[in-house]
Amino acid sequence: MEQVIWDKIYFGDSINDCAPQKQFGHILHILCMEGSMSFVFHDVRYNIAKGDYVILPNRSLACSFSESSDFDAIIMSLSESFVTSMALRSNYGIIGHLSLLQNPVMRLSENDFRKCRTDMSRLRERLNDREHLFREEMLGHLLLAHILDLYDIHARGRKPEPIPERAISLLRQFIEMLYLISKLYSMSGRHSARSVYM
């Protein structure tokens, strides 16, 4: 399938299309459609199968990807700055972000799987609509709907405690600082991204 490239949303056919050096500042989403895949994230090996949804907030923290011969997935890379520029009133993003740093895999129900597959397929299809006069805003709203679906799926699996607005802001700034430090270290070649978090 042809790759669709835009600086804010990118779809690839393989995990190799999303190399960490090309994807800094991007969040990687993988919806497994068939087969299986494994990878290492924070020294833990994860094995995913059909119906699993992976969100890697920082692609450089994952390695040792391997796919089964029948592996098929929707692989989407999102510009973090594009996502944060959208007017989300919910603060769930920071809760989900911290949780994903601990475990980036969500096991979906059949209904949630269909919903995510439809959302992502629609985004990929509309990404090709280059003549749309309000393309960026239209894609932003489609993406926003998908993100809110993901918040709902993730939140149903846990009972989050309310977090004050100031704490959310400080956590967001702290995470951004860690990513910047990680990028600087990886560019210098002296340290692995993992060492920044130790």
State where each predicted segment sits.
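Generic protein-terminus/edge-of-domain signal
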Residues: M1-D52
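Short histidine-centered beta-strand/loop micro-motifs
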Residues: N16-F24, S64-E67, L108, P162
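Amphipathic, well-ordered alpha-helical segments in soluble domains
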Residues: L28, K115-R122, L142, H146-D149
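Short beta-strand His + acidic residue motifs that chelate non-heme Fe in jelly-roll/DSBH
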Residues: S38-V40, L61-S68
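Conserved metal-binding segment of the jelly-roll/cupin
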Residues: I48-L61, S77
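A hydrophobic/aromatic-rich effector-binding and dimerization subdomain
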Residues: E67-D129
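Short, Lys/Arg-enriched, Trp-marked, Pro/Gly-tolerant hinge/linker segments that flank
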Residues: L108, R130-M138, L150-R190, R194
